[in-house]
Structure formats: C-alpha cells, structure tokens
Amino acid sequence: MNRRLSIFVIILFFLLPVAARAQVTGSFRFAQLTDIHLNPNNPKPTEDLKRSVEQINATPGIDFVLVTGDLTEEGDRTTMLVVKSILDQLKVKYYVIPGNHETKW
C-alpha cells in the first residue's frame, strides 16, 4: 500500500507543473440550432431554419454553430440534403451532432 501511495505522489509531483501551466487561450462564441424537424409536408420549419441562418450570419463575433440533433422529422436523405443546403449558407463553420430522428431511432 505504501508503494502505491509513493508512486501516486511521484506521478502527482510531475503532473502538477503541467496543470499549473494550463491557461485559457481566449474565449469563443457559438450559436446552437436544435430540433429543427424539417418536414417536406410543412414549410414552417424550413422558413424558421432559413431565418435562423440569416440571423446568425448577421450577428458579429460568432465563431461556429452547433447543430444538436433532430434536423429532420423522418431522417430521410432528401430532407437532410435540404437542411445541408441551408446550413451551407452559414458564414462560419458548423458541426452537426445527429439526433434520434437522424439515426432512425
């Protein structure tokens, strides 16, 4: 048991200076879009997404956009391509995290 404690203390001794040197390199701002639920039978979510993209593009200082799931109602390829074509109009990078609607739950 003492040997384990000694090894732990030695490892901790070498790791503390590394942790102490860690610094925040700056801040960032992002926008999040979620639960868009685009549906070919309902134009409202498509209009909402287009308006959101316009608002994000008009907002200064946004570094990236997170799109956190449920982009489409049914997860079909055609609707996902529509979502992509709209998101491609963003002036910043975007990152998509699939939701249960994209993975066919």
Predicted features along the sequence, with ranges:
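Bacterial N-terminal signal peptides
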Residues: 8-17
